[in-house]
């Protein structure tokens, strides 16, 4: 199979939405019957985002094969059916690490290692490998043209443009076309300078995606075409919209997919965007609203919980309700108590690391349990629910996780190296001292308890979900917790690890050690999120009847 490559760059400012634009184009091409994949090339020196602060970088998206990647890969999976893997995201740090490892082994036979050709060759190899087996590979270059960090990536795609030829490569550049209120017009000069910068390093864009808060007038598009040496039909206006799921139709209406298909001489059907039209209709026509309180640690940056936010919206689509997310700092719960949890239709506690705010999350789980409020715990959200139950129901007053209190008399949650075996002996397992790459990662099979809410949600006796954690439920306390009424509704493939818990006599109190948000999509939703939002809606209706 001959793969065609579309390289997506950005200019003027960051956060223009390259990932959304790339994913939207991929969705249109997929709707035309093409096999499409998307890659993200990140210019930072970190090997991967696994140890980066969520408040700086946003969430870490975990792929099926366990790669810790950029959150843009979440957008990719939500827009197209192709599943991402570790070949779809790599960083400058990863490239340098691999090149230096080869140099230490002597693979370069004593040559002087340089950015060109050694680093650029390594980048090209990864791009070509990532595109194998697909009709079209869209490659997003992180950062902004002009950044010193991006230069090796830009040089690499310039070389690929020459080596593969125009019939296999296309360069798409996103720029900002701002509107100046004082002048009453849009300004094209930033776009002209951005394209000039790109051309100075040898890349001539074939398509310009012009971002702005309004549609670009025809005369300004003609002006951009003239000064940037791009066909007028290839100057695409991409205005702000109230839903990112409207963007595929917006790009298609301007013929972007047809331009790509003709450039690559591809034979394929017309795009069928009916699934996306259905998503847009559901989003615009809810039959009600629910308020979900998300009790977390990183709420100052919503992107830290990007996939959770989107999964809640998807569940709203499936339940025909609008989901309003109320972000609640878990430290605020610690300081003010449950008064900040009033008026909610459901509580969700997402994943996280570190001790800060954990008692607030435990209080949130207690509030939901005692008030029959729908509760959904994800990763740490499951662990705090278990800790709360152990303390206040099972009689283990000082129960905790060894992540937060190594001296706890009831370590109901322990590090993966601290598991207790079936005879009650502490089993120490080896763990590298580095934080990066030492977690349980990727898709894992989970067996579901027959008749449980989890099994009802999945409509089956098993599921496959993605993990990202170092701590597990300590099996030493499993029997005692079960006797107190906790239901262990999900177990690992070998049935030795607890994957899900729930409460029997509660409208909807379900938690999982995994991250179901990573597999939710606007077209398909996710069973657990759908069940949670349905329970929140039912809770609201019960309150209204009182």
Curated annotation (Swiss-Prot):
Q: Which residues bind CTP?
A: 14, 147-149, 187-192, 223
What Pfam families does the record tag this protein with? CTP_synth_N, GATase
Q: Where does ATP bind?
A: 15-20, 72, 239-241
Q: Which residues form the active site?
A: 379 (nucleophile), 515, 517
Key words of the record: ATP-binding, Glutamine amidotransferase, Ligase, Magnesium, Metal-binding, Nucleotide-binding, Pyrimidine biosynthesis
Q: Does the keyword Metal-binding apply?
A: yes
Pathway(s) served: Pyrimidine metabolism; CTP biosynthesis via de novo pathway; CTP from UDP: step 2/2
Annotated EC: 6.3.4.2
Signal peptide interval: none
Q: Which residues of this UniProt protein bind Mg(2+)?
A: 72, 140
What does the entry list as the binding residues for UTP?
A: 14, 187-192, 223
- Set out the biological process GO terms recorded for this chain's protein: 'de novo' CTP biosynthetic process; CTP biosynthetic process; pyrimidine nucleobase biosynthetic process
Q: What controls how active this protein is?
A: Allosterically activated by GTP, when glutamine is the substrate; GTP has no effect on the reaction when ammonia is the substrate. The allosteric effector GTP functions by stabilizing the protein conformation that binds the tetrahedral intermediate(s) formed during glutamine hydrolysis. Inhibited by the product CTP, via allosteric rather than competitive inhibition.
Entry keyword annotation includes Nucleotide-binding: yes
The record's region (Amidoligase domain) falls at 1-266
- Gene Ontology cellular-component terms listed: cytosol
What the entry lists under HAMAP family is as follows: PyrG
Question: What is this protein called in UniProt?
Answer: CTP synthase
């Amino acid at each position: 199979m001959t793969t065609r490559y579309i390289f997506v760059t950005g200019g003027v400012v960051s956060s223009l939405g390259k990932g959304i634009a790339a994913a939207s184009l991929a969705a249109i091409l997929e709707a035309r019957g093409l096999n499409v994949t998307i890659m993200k090339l990140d210019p930072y020196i970190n090997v991967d985002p696994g140890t980066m602060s969520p408040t700086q970088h946003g969430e870490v998206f975990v792929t099926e094969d366990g790669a810790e990647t950029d959150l843009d890969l979440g957008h990719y999976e939500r827009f197209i059916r192709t599943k991402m893997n570790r070949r779809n995201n790599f960083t400058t740090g990863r490239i340098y690490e691999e090149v230096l490892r080869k140099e230490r082994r002597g693979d370069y036979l004593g040559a002087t290692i340089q950015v060109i050709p050694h680093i650029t060759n390594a980048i090209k190899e990864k791009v070509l490998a990532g595109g194998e087996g697909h009709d079209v590979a869209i490659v997003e270059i992180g950062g902004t043209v002009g950044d010193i960090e991006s230069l090796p990536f830009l040089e690499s795609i310039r070389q690929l443009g020459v080596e593969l030829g125009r019939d296999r490569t296309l360069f798409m550049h996103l720029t900002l076309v701002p509107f100046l209120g004082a002048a009453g017009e849009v300004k094209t000069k930033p776009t002209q300078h951005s394209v000039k910068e790109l051309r100075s390093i040898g890349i001539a864009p074939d398509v310009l995606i012009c971002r702005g808060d309004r549609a670009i007038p025809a005369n300004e598009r003609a002006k951009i075409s003239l000064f940037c040496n791009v066909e007028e039909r290839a100057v695409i206006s991409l205005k702000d919209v109230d839903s990112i799921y409207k963007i595929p139709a917006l790009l298609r209406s301007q013929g972007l997919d047809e331009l790509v298909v003709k450039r690559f001489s591809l034979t394929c059907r017309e795009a069928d965007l009916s699934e996306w039209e259905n998503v847009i209709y559901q989003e615009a026509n809810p039959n009600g609203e629910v308020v979900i309180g998300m009790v977390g640690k990183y709420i100052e940056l919503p992107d830290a919980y990007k996939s959770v936010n989107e999964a809640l919206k998807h569940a709203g689509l499936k339940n025909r309700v609008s989901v309003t997310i109320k972000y609640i700092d878990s430290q605020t719960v610690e300081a003010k108590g449950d008064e900040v949890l009033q008026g909610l239709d459901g509580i969700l506690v997402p994943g996280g690391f570190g001790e800060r705010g954990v008692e607030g999350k435990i209080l949130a789980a207690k509030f939901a349990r005692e008030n029959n409020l729908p509760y959904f715990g994800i990763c740490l959200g499951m662990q705090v629910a278990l800790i709360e139950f152990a303390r206040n129901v099972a009689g283990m007053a000082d129960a905790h996780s060894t992540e937060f209190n190594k001296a706890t008399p009831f370590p109901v949650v322990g590090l993966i190296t601290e598991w207790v075996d079936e005879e009650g002996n502490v089993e120490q397992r080896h763990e590298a001292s580095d934080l990066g790459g030492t977690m349980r990662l990727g898709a894992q099979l989970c067996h579901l308890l027959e008749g449980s809410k989890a099994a009802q949600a999945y409509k089956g006796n098993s599921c496959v979900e993605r993990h990202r954690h170092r701590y597990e439920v300590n099996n030493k306390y499993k029997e005692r917790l079960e006797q107190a009424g906790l239901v262990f509704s999900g177990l690992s493939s070998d049935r030795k690890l607890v994957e899900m818990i729930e409460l029997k006599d509660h409208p909807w109190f379900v938690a999982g050690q995994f991250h179901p948000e990573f597999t939710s999509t606007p077209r398909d939703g996710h069973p657990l999120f759908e069940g949670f939002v349905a329970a929140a809606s039912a809770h609201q209706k019960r309150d209204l009847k009182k």
